[in-house]
C-alpha cells in the first residue's frame, strides 16, 4: 500500500473526547500497519517518477495542524498541508484537540506563529477549530515546548522562520558561511504542500 491509497479518516462527526482519542489511536495504528516503516512521499521535481528525500516514520506519534473548517476539509481531500506563517512554513503541535478550548488554543497558536500564511491565527479562534492529524517528516524541526498540566507538548515546523530547539542561530550562520552556504534542498514552495494526512477532525469536543 502507498500513501496515495491511504483513506484519510474523517472524524468530524466525533463529538466526545474518549471516542476521539480511540479513533485517532486506531488511525495511527492502521497507518503504521498498512505502510512500510519509512515512507517517502514527495514526488521529485528533478527525477520524474521518483521521490525526493523527505520521509516519515509511520510508527510514531501524531501531531496536529490546527485550521479553520473550509481549509481543513480541502486539505484532507487533496492531501495538503497549509502554511501558517508568512514565509510558507507549517507549524504542528503535540497539543491534542481535547486539551484546551478554542480561545486558549488560539492564544498559544498566536505565540508560535506570525501574522501570515494561508492560516492566520490572529483572525480569531475560528481559525483553529478543526485539525489535521499527521506524523512529522524528517523536514520538521522541533522548535519549542510548552508545559501544560505538568506534561511537555512539542511544537514542530516544516520551513518558515523557525530554528530547532536548542540551536544557536549565530553558530549556525558561521558554520554555513565557512562551508560556503547551506546545500540547496529540493522542496515545494507555496502555501500548500503535498503531505500524508492521517485524519481530519473537529475540536468541538465534550467529555
UniProtKB/Swiss-Prot annotation:
Presence of keyword Zinc: no
Residue ranges, annotated region (Disordered): 160-183
Protein name: Protein 6b
Role according to the record: Involved in tumor formation and increases auxin and cytokinin effects in host plants.
Compositional bias annotation for Acidic residues: 164-178
InterPro entries (UniProt xref): Glycosidase
The organism's place on the tree of life at top rank: Bacteria
Keyword vocabulary terms for this entry: Crown gall tumor, Plasmid
Amino acid at each position: 500500500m502507498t500513501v496515495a491509497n491511504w483513506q484519510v479518516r474523517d472524524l468530524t462527526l466525533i463529538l466526545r473526547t474518549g471516542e476521539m482519542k480511540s479513533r485517532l489511536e486506531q488511525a495511527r495504528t492502521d497507518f503504521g500497519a498498512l505502510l512500510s516503516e519509512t515512507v517517502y512521499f514527495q514526488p521529485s521535481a528533478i527525477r520524474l517518477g521518483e521521490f525526493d528525500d523527505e520521509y516519515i516514520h509511520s510508527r510514531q506519534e501524531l501531531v496536529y495542524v490546527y485550521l479553520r473548517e473550509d481549509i481543513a476539509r480541502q486539505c484532507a481531500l487533496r492531501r495538503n498541508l497549509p502554511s501558517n506563517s508568512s514565509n510558507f512554513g507549517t507549524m504542528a503541535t503535540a497539543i491534542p484537540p481535547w486539551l484546551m478550548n478554542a480561545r486558549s488554543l488560539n492564544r498559544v497558536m498566536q505565540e508560535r506563529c506570525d501574522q501570515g500564511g494561508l492560516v492566520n491565527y490572529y483572525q480569531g479562534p475560528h481559525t483553529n477549530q478543526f485539525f489535521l492529524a499527521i506524523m512529522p517528516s524528517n523536514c520538521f524541526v522541533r522548535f519549542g515546548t510548552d508545559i501544560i498540566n505538568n506534561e511537555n507538548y512539542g511544537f514542530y515546523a516544516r520551513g518558515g522562520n523557525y530554528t530547532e530547539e536548542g540551536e544557536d542561530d549565530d553558530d549556525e550562520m558561521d558554520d554555513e558561511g565557512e562551508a560556503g552556504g547551506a546545500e540547496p534542498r529540493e522542496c515545494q514552495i507555496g502555501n500548500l504542500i503535498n503531505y500524508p494526512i492521517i485524519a481530519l477532525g473537529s475540536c468541538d469536543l465534550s467529555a
